[in-house]
Amino acid sequence: MLITLSISCKRDTDIVDPTPVVNPGQPTTPATGAVTPVAAPEGAAITAIIGPAGGTIESADKRIQVQIPAGALTTSQTISVQPLGQNNCPAGSGQAFRLTPHGLTFAKPATVTFQYTSKDVNGTAPELLRVAYQTDKGSWQSPSVKGLDTTARTVSIQTTHFSDWGLFKSMYISPDQSFVNPGGSQQLRVFQTGKPLVEGDELFVPLPTLVDTKYIEKWSLAGAGTLAHQHNTGDYYAPETIPATNPVSVTVFLNKTETIDGKVYKDLRLVTSIFVAPEGVSIQIGAGGAWQTFPGGANINSTQNIILGKTGDTFAMVGWVGKPTGVYQWTAGTTVSFVSQNGPTMTYSHLYGKNVSGGSLQVNNEHETWVVGTFTLTSSGWIESVPPPKYGTTSIRGVFRVKRV
């Protein structure tokens, strides 16, 4: 999920089209299971010999765990867990795994537990995650969820056989995160992957369709811009300038509950984040100053991470040592730093003499295409090198949306 810099917050009035239309998401026939390719393995398998006494096996990254109870097996078996290159389940989220041997039937159900990440629930909610397996015909089926632990971030089901397994979103807003230019727009849609015809039955996982509008309670926008929505679709319109809060968020409140292991979950919401910034590195010098945007890129590595935007002899750069996603305070050295050259004579820094500016750098490196973030300096030191040199401090805001180089 993207990191938010909260300088100020503005909530614009939603724009709702009152004209009734036929709901494009209203299902007319029962959904059937979607057939997808079988994914190739990726990485080494973890194996364990488990016999009649039962046992546990988990993946190297602990994203999946299988607990086989005593009495489930009559003889010792070599059980393996192997990550797959793709999660091909419709609306799949996160890593998929191959559990073998296929064709083995347990006398008692085994428990399969997936650990989800914050990225896995982008655009959905933990209560709406489900687990599915791929059949020998290529379709996907989902047993009912037997356990949800939102503290440990785990979802569990029970099964009497092995196959290829993965998480998927039973209901979600798409895209779950997006990036638009100031003045641009983003189309939003709410999808579902169906419900079992009989409670407790396995769900044949179909291709996602627009959600039945009876499940939509309302839409809400937090941040600058405007939101037009109708039933299960919406459109976000970004402000003409870089907003004070990035990203903005759109929330769809659902008119439904989920019951998992006897517990009823209410107040379900789907949230998508929208990062509003031009491609490149943008800075605003002084309160109310004009934004300047420079083309640039990100060099993310284990030694020193750099975000640099440059046009001619004018540039802006932030650097930090540490994880590629996080929140960092400026330091006296170059561990977390900012420098900008504005023409041949004007230089800005996160330092003013020995004083370190207040503010912070916030970076998100989780998206496959973009590295995005924001930064503030409450008292950036500046020097004008034209004789006689002049010195001072000013505030600086920055935002970046760049690709890795």
State each model region's role.
Residues 5-8:
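C-terminal motif of bacterial Sec signal peptides marking the signal peptidase cleavage site
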Residues 12-65, 72-76, 89, 103-104, ...:
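Proteolytic cleavage junctions
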Residues 43, 112-118, 398:
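Catalytic cores of nucleotide-enabled group-transfer and carboxylate-activating enzymes in metabolic
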Residues 64, 95-97, 334, 357-361, ...:
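One face of beta-strands
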Residues 105-110:
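Extended extracellular/luminal ectodomain segments enriched in beta-structured repeat modules
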Residues 172, 376-405:
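Edge beta-strand at a domain terminus
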Residues 280-285, 346-349, 381-391:
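Flexible, membrane-facing loop/turn or short amphipathic-helix motifs
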Residues 282-284, 288-370:
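Surface-exposed helix/loop patches within compact recognition domains
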